[in-house]
Curated annotation (Swiss-Prot):
It comes from the Eukaryota. This is DNA-directed RNA polymerase subunit beta. Pfam families: RNA_pol_Rpb2_2, RNA_pol_Rpb2_3, RNA_pol_Rpb2_6, RNA_pol_Rpb2_7. CDD domains: RNA_pol_B_RPB2. DNA-dependent RNA polymerase catalyzes the transcription of DNA into RNA using the four ribonucleoside triphosphates as substrates. NCBIfam families: PRK00405.1. One of its GO terms (biological process) is DNA-templated transcription. It is found in: Plastid, Chloroplast. Keywords: Chloroplast, DNA-directed RNA polymerase, Nucleotidyltransferase, Plastid, Transcription, Transferase.
Length: 1071
């Protein structure tokens, strides 16, 4: 619950509520709508009829639990059963059976779906709303050309445009346009009806000549003319039913189906009263649109802003799942139709069970969740990431935009985003502005609009009412901005307040206000709402902070922030990582595995806890019990904290003592200097779990097998395997050790043996193994402890069932040089040096500083909020207080943030008897000492407690070295990237740098032996072993030879010539 400055109480909606409401709408309405569209299917002789009785369909409770679905790599889904009937018209008999249609993946309590053991989430898509939109563009002569775009429910466009002679054209393609009278006549209107239904009949009569009047004389002629122009067909086509069907399929179905949203928008924009159930474009719509276009030409009416949210709609999870369900039913219809015809042809008696298969529905949803761009793997780096992912909104995807074609105006912030889409939280890079995040109070309306709540101000009654407004409604209201919340009712009537009206920001009297914001967080997303003092930060830095909080790694010992915003508890609660008591009761047993709670009766409920579970970002998800045995609980209390939560609050980082000062250049360019206390005290230690898997296959020589008897391998590498050939739980694994022993059979032909094998067989008669080892080995950087092994046997119809073995290894990672850390204000940096604590700068009470940041990173980046947080955090640490501060506290008075921080520092200095905490000469700063010499620094320095996060970008995942590896086939140069064991490339600029220092031999090595000279790099190994001199290469490297070949493909021969020193005679020598 949040209370604003004056009165009224408002509950923050659940952060996953949008996902829940969308899925519930699909189950409650979408399934029924699509099932009612399923037609009655008859055979060719119309003797048998198949139909579904959709009013009594049922979904069965899943047979497995969520945890089991994840563990066994299954889909958490429900079976759909629908009654079906098969009617014989000749005998009037009917056979009714309840048939299994397929599996529908369900949504769990996190708002996600589990498909093949993987958490997946469907994000919301923003599309152009169907309807008509008017805009004006300048042609090459600088004259305004007015156009009206009719957008269908499927995204198809039809353009109407009016030229300088006031002639109206319908554009059927980029190059073809025809008179507006032709499509109107093709849709069934004659010329008299057209003239009777328009406001400007004289304009419609002005431009058709006798030839054009003949084209629209009848509907058939109009359809032929329309088809000829649309399909670019020459000659004289003949009117036929097939031609009409083709035109219907290619044009009218794609460009003229408006849908419910399009019909509502069309009626509202053109002031029509066509019934809402009429979902297709009518001649009356086209004529009204042309009338409106003529009015635009003569200065009447307003143009449309295509980027306004009232002209956008949201495709939520309900719409996407319903579309896929409809697609699956169409496929099922084709299957049933083909099966009926086949049964009649072979004189078989069909039954509903035989006609229907579950394959279309199951495969459609598996394909959707696995391949659709809007179905993404849930990012589970930390609890915040999980809930933010489900609230994303994207302009990308099918029917949407692409990152390369989207204009700057689409990406930019729009006034209609206020309270609906966060103006800060978006992705960086090519998709900036195209992937946003919904504001925390926003909700999705029934017809796909984003609604935001406001308090309605009534002059008659003093009661406060909450109303949700869609983007097309709040333009008619004067909405007071958030800084008017703290005014008293008596003073408000005399105040002049800033307000928003028709996308403009005004300053008006309070009595003219209709609505006001409910809370300052209203227009921010969850990530931006967790930044304290966000009003003091530049928006670009706040954007970085919103993104970097989602990259924070859960630490082994979490700690909640001293300075927060108050939303930490709600974020942790809605993320689902904490265990919550679902009823009143008493704790009767607790351990690391489960908590047993006794309810009101004698029943005991066992609540399993998550123990060292791997997320898809390799972070560790773990729950720790927080309740002792014998404690009585109320419903909703915390039973166990999850990863990155403490006491039910979000805890992504640590409160550490920081100072802003240069230190020997080690914090140059955002580098960070840290104390060794952060390493040895396990302050920033985190656990990471990696998954390694191997699968057995059936080869042409026989099946592969798992065993611990691997020939030709050292016993040291096999020391951790059990009798089955699988690594034992609890083993400590080093790089190169065998995790799973596997042998693959190979051919026993004599020619396939190596020479030494043939020699052994000939001399000693030893039988050489006919299997090669294809074991699962631990790669570089994977050392750790085995915490879980899963042996999954996949069932199948064959005698051999493939097996999959997964090994989970836990790593303990301390913070080290190269790791990335960041604050909550966009202040990020890389660890450059770890100093002994005695060498770190220390305070006047002897406390060494934990981190040293560069002070130059503050003024130019304008993220001053970190200074307020730093100073207030120091006061909170000394006073043992936690602060929760809403943004924009300047709405109370000027310099409110400074007036909050300084009194707290003053009180801390008094209570702790440390006058250096608050010195009036330089408040917020203190004189500190150099740990190496003990001398004070020349200038006072800002010191304090900041909340610093350790990010997922860690040096252990990025550092890479190569001694030998693969080469590219064409250029024969080392591959690129850590994943391919690639090498460094000495490019053009690197060669310039080497040439600048005159290092000729190093340049030659880099360009020949260590790169793409095939013969030379083979000779290097032998000469190195015997200690000889590496010979100079005699021919050109492979990249030069490639250049020569490419020139030859262009018919250019490249030769080189030698000029003798004596007589300068030219001797030709072939290259």
């Amino acid at each position: 619950m949040l209370r604003d400055g004056n009165e009224g109480m408002f509950t923050i909606p659940g952060f996953s509520q949008i996902q829940f409401e969308g899925f519930f709408r699909f189950i409650d309405q979408g399934l029924t709508e699509e099932l009612h569209k399923f037609p009655k299917i008859e055979d060719t002789d119309q003797e048998i009829e198949f139909q579904l009785f959709v009013d009594t369909y049922r979904l069965v409770e899943p047979l497995i639990k969520e945890r089991d679905a994840v563990y066994e790599s299954l889909t958490y889904s429900s079976e759909l059963y629908v009654p079906a009937g098969l009617i014989w018209k000749t005998g009037r008999d009917m056979q009714e059976q309840t048939i299994f249609i397929g599996n529908i993946p369900l949504m769990n309590s996190l708002g996600t779906s589990i498909v093949n053991g993987i958490y997946r989430i469907v994000i919301n898509q923003i599309l152009q709303s169907p309807g008509i939109y008017y805009r004006s563009e300048l042609d090459h002569n600088g004259i305004s050309v007015y156009t009206g775009s009719i957008i269908s429910d499927w995204g198809g466009r039809s353009e109407l445009e009016i030229d300088r002679k006031a002639r109206i054209w319908a554009r059927v393609s980029r190059k073809q346009k025809i008179s507006i009278l032709v499509p109107s006549s093709a849709m069934g209107s004659n010329l008299r009806e057209i003239l009777d239904n328009v406001c400007y009949p004289e304009i419609f009569l002005s431009f058709p000549n006798e030839k054009e009047k003949k084209k629209i004389g009848s509907r058939e002629n109009a359809i032929l003319e329309f088809y000829q122009q649309f399909a670019c067909v020459g000659g004289d086509p003949v009117f036929s039913e097939s031609l009409c069907k083709e035109l219907q399929k290619k044009f009218f179905q794609q460009r003229c189906e408006l849908g419910r949203i399009g019909r509502r928008n069309m009626n509202w924009r053109l002031n029509l009263d066509i019934p809402q159930n009429n979902l297709f474009l009518l001649p009356r719509d086209v004529l009204a649109a042309a009338d409106h276009l003529i009015g635009m030409k003569f200065g009447m009416g307003t143009l449309d802003d295509m980027n306004h949210l009232k002209n956008k709609r949201i495709r939520s999870v309900a719409d996407l799942l319903q579309d896929q369900f409809g697609l699956a039913l169409v496929r099922l219809e084709n299957v049933v139709r083909g099966t009926i015809c086949g049964a009649i042809r072979h004189k078989l008696i069909p039954t509903p069970h035989n006609l229907v298969t579950s394959t279309p529905l199951t495969t459609t949803y598996e394909s959707f969740f696995g391949l659709h761009p809007l179905s993404q793997v849930l990012d589970r780096t930390n609890p915040l990431t999980q809930i933010v992912h489900g609230r994303k909104s994207s302009y990308l995807g099918p029917g949407g935009l692409t990152g390369r074609t989207a204009s700057f105006r689409i990406r930019d912030i729009h006034p209609s985003h206020y309270g609906r889409i966060c103006p800060i939280d978006t992705s960086e890079g090519i998709n900036v502005g195209l992937i946003g995040s919904l504001a925390i109070h926003a909700r999705i309306g029934y017809l796909g609009s984003i609604e935001s709540p406001f308090y309605e101000i009534s002059q008659r009654s003093k009661e406060v009412q909450t109303v949700y407004l869609s983007p097309n409604r709040d333009e008619y209201y004067m909405v007071a901005a958030g800084n008017s919340l703290a005014l008293n009712q008596g003073i408000q009537e005399e105040q002049v307040v800033p307000a928003r009206y028709r996308q403009e920001f005004l300053t008006i009297a309070w009595e003219q206000i209709h609505l006001r914001s409910i809370f300052p967080f209203q227009y921010f997303s969850i990530g931006a709402s967790l930044i304290p003092f966000i009003e003091h930060n530049d928006a670009n830095r706040a954007l970085m902070s919103s993104n970097m909080q989602r990259q924070a790694v859960p630490l082994s010992r979490s700690e909640k922030c001293i300075v927060g915003t108050g939303l930490e508890r709600q974020a942790a609660l809605d993320s689902g990582v904490s265990a919550i008591a679902e009823q009143d009761g008493k704790i009767i047993y607790t351990d690391t595995d489960k908590i047993v709670l006794s309810g009101n009766g004698d029943t005991a409920i066992s609540i399993p806890l998550v123990i060292y579970q791997r997320s898809n970002k390799n972070t560790c998800m773990h729950q720790k019990p927080q309740v002792p045995r014998g404690k009585c609980l109320k419903k909703g209390q915390i039973l166990a904290d999850g990863a990155a939560t403490v006491g039910g609050e979000l805890a992504l980082g640590k409160n550490v003592l920081v100072s802003y000062m240069p230190w020997e250049g080690y914090n140059f360019e955002d580098a960070v200097l840290i104390s060794e206390r952060l390493v040895y005290g396990d302050i920033y230690t985190s656990f990471h779990i990696r998954k390694y898997e191997i699968q057995t296959h059936v080869t042409s020589q026989g099946p592969e097998r798992i065993t611990n008897e691997i020939p030709h391998l050292e016993a040291h590498l096999l020391r951790n395997l059990d009798i089955n050939g699988i690594v034992m739980l609890g083993s400590w694994i080093e790089t190169g050790d065998i995790l799973v022993g596997k042998l693959t059979p190979q051919t026993a032909k004599e020619s396939s043996y190596a020479p030494e094998d043939r020699l052994l067989r000939a001399i000693l008669g030893i039988q050489v193994s006919t299997a090669k080892e294809t074991c699962l080995k631990l790669p570089i950087g994977g050392r750790g402890r085995v915490i879980d092994v899963r042996w999954i046997q996949k069932g199948g119809g064959s005698s051999y069932n493939p097996e999959m073995i997964r090994v989970y290894i836990s790593q303990k990672r301390e913070i080290k040089v190269g790791d990335k850390v960041a604050g909550r204000h966009g202040n990020k940096g890389i660890i450059s040096k770890i100093l002994p604590r005695q060498d770190m700068p220390y305070l006047q009470d002897g406390t060494p500083v934990d981190m040293v940041f560069n002070p130059l990173g503050v003024p130019s980046r304008m993220n001053v909020g970190q200074i307020f947080e730093c100073s207030l955090g120091l006061a909170g640490d000394l006073l043992d207080r936690h602060y929760r501060i809403a943004p924009f506290d300047e709405r109370y008075e000027q310099e409110a943030s400074r007036k909050l921080v300084f009194p707290e520092l003053y009180e801390a200095s008094k209570q702790t008897a440390n006058p250096w905490v608050f010195e009036p000469e330089y408040p917020g700063k203190s004189r500190i000492f150099d740990g190496r010499t003990g001398d004070p620094f020349e200038q006072p320095v800002i010191i304090g407690k900041s909340y610093i996060l350790k990010l997922i970008h860690q040096v252990d995942d990025k550092i890479h070295g190569r001694s030998s590896g693969h080469y590219a086939l064409v250029t024969q140069q080392p591959l690129r990237g850590r994943a391919k064991q690639g090498g460094q490339r000495v490019g053009e600029m690197e060669v310039w740098a080497l040439e600048g220092f005159g290092v000729a031999h190093i340049s030659q090595e880099m360009l020949t032996y260590k790169s793409d000279h095939i013969r030379a790099r083979q000779e290097v190994l032998g000469t190195t072993i015997i200690g000889g001199t590496i010979p100079n290469p005699e021919d050109a490297p492979e990249s030069f030879r490639l250049l020569v070949r490419e020139l030859r493909s262009l018919a250019l021969e490249l030769n080189h010539f030698l000029v003798s020193e004596k007589n300068f005679q030219i001797h030709r020598k072939e290259a």
